[in-house]
């Protein structure tokens, strides 16, 4: 890769640990049915496309597109969209949604850490709660910079460490620790880490805190949906014995109660994320 060198100030990670984490994550995202949860996040894709100020006819690459929230939003704005993910089942869900909405776009299986596109191929690159989960963070950031045209923009939506989803993953990590040396995905939700990944010599970073609101019938309903359909939570419970599952469930219910602003028995939980626009120099 033309921009794959490690960024200054960021220590290298043990390759064996990154490989183990990547294999674990692939299994997690391939399990359950992420689209059940992912489609509720569609508003984030619409907001990010507006923040990017997309222009009709421009080329857009959606990296780790999942079920296509960003891709569909960009296609609605008459962009030429290529949706990529390394989990084929997720791309199939995105295809189903595009067909239902009668939107034209391209789909390609691809690894965010090794994108199969030439340098400066796209006017825009984006990732919504996707690239932040790559084990080799520097490599994934370098790939986004590489495929985006000079003068183009990269748009990201990343959960923050202190928000609800950031705390969800922190809670899970206490019960199912990641491989040694792995960096938290939620670091992508901090300005300091973004400035390491996208240094000022290559890009300018504008990060705006936003809130996505999870709305469920109750906290128990939310937990049931996430345990059944959201791969990382499903897999976490699957690695624990009955006692461990009970403890984790109790802690997640406590977490939901702490963030819940509803007082009528339902669940209304804001979760902070960073909406990021990166201008490629």
Give short role names for the model-derived ranges.
Residues 5-55, 69, 93, 223, ...:
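Conserved class I S-adenosyl-L-methionine
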Residues 59-114, 139:
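Class I SAM-dependent methyltransferase SAM/SAH-binding core
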Residues 113-124:
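A short acidic, Gly/Pro-enriched loop at the edge of an enzyme's catalytic core
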Residues 123-137:
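A short SAM/SAH-binding and catalytic strip from SAM-dependent methyltransferases
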Residues 138-139, 145, 149-218, 233:
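Conserved catalytic/acceptor-binding region of the Class I
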Residues 186-281:
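Conserved Class I S-adenosyl-L-methionine
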């Amino acid at each position: 890769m033309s921009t794959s060198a490690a960024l200054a100030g960021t220590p290298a990670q043990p390759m064996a640990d990154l490989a183990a984490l990547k294999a674990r994550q692939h299994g997690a995202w391939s399990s359950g049915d992420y689209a059940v949860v992912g489609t509720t996040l569609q508003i984030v894709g619409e907001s990010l496309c507006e923040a990017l100020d997309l222009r009709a006819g421009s080329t857009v690459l959606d990296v780790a597109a999942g079920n296509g929230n960003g891709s569909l939003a960009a296609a609605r704005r008459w962009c030429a969209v290529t949706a990529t993910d390394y989990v084929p089942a997720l791309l199939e869900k995105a295809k189903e949604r595009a067909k239902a909405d009668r939107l034209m776009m391209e789909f390609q299986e691809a690894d965010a850490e090794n994108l199969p596109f030439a340098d400066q191929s796209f006017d825009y690159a984006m990732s919504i709660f996707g690239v932040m989960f790559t084990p080799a963070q520097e490599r994934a950031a370098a790939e986004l910079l590489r495929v985006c045209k000079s003068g183009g923009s990269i748009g990201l939506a990343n959960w923050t460490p202190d928000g609800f989803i950031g705390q969800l993953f922190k809670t899970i990590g206490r019960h199912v620790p990641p491989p040694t040396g792995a960096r938290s995905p939620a670091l992508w939700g901090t300005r300091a880490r973004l400035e390491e990944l996208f240094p000022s010599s290559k890009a300018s970073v504008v990060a705006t805190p936003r809130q996505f609101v999870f709305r469920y019938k109750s906290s128990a309903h939310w937990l049931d949906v996430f345990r059944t359909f959201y791969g990382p939570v499903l897999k976490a419970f699957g690695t624990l014995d009955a006692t461990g599952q009970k403890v984790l469930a109790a802690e997640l219910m406590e977490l939901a109660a702490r963030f819940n602003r509803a007082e009528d028995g339902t669940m209304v939980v804001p979760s902070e994320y960073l909406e990021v626009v990166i201008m490629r120099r």
